[in-house]
Amino acid sequence: MDKKTKLLLEKGESLPIMEAFYTIQGEGYHKGMASYFIRTGGCDIGCHWCDVKESWDENSHPIISVEEIVKKSAGLSDFVVVTGGEPLMWNMNPLTKALKRLSKKTHIETSGAYPLTGFWDWICLSPKKAKLPIQDAYNN
């Protein structure tokens, strides 16, 4: 990976994206809500029951600019769910700021193993025994 791309990833201005798609939220409090899902690449938790093990290796997914990610979400749904992998391996501030400028409701699905970044309307915390949440995960 070149230095420029690495810097964009560190700043959260670009992210490894496995997939992004419009669908109906199928679980939890917002079940049945039309949503746009953004699935980030990268996860070091290693849950043996994971249904998206393909997301674990961040290097196997394209690095996409936040501008492009947000552009693709425009007009599809007012609810955006960021999931993974483990999205909090990355700085979510630029993505959520850009989504908020479009008046999107931002939801995240996380293990809580990394510090919370971003501006979220809904946090779905799913602790994992393999890598426990950091204490701050319970304070937000």
Regions found by a protein language model. Give the residues of each.
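Active-site beta-strand/loop signature of hydrolases that rely on acidic residues for catalysis
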Residues: 83-85
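Conserved AdoMet/S-adenosylmethionine-binding subsite of the radical SAM
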Residues: 88-140
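Structural preference for beta-strand elements that scaffold enzyme active sites
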Residues: 35-37, 49, 79-81, 105-107, ...
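Conserved alpha-helical substructure of the radical SAM core
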Residues: 51-81
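Short, flexible, glycine/charge-rich loop motifs used to bind or transfer phosphoryl groups or to couple energy/partner
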Residues: 26-27, 69-72, 112-116
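N-terminal [4Fe-4S]-dependent radical SAM core
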Residues: 1-62
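Flexible, charged surface loops at secondary-structure boundaries
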Residues: 31-32, 73-76, 100, 116-119
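Glycine-/small-residue-rich active-site loops that bind phosphorylated ligands and cofactors
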Residues: 57, 87-88
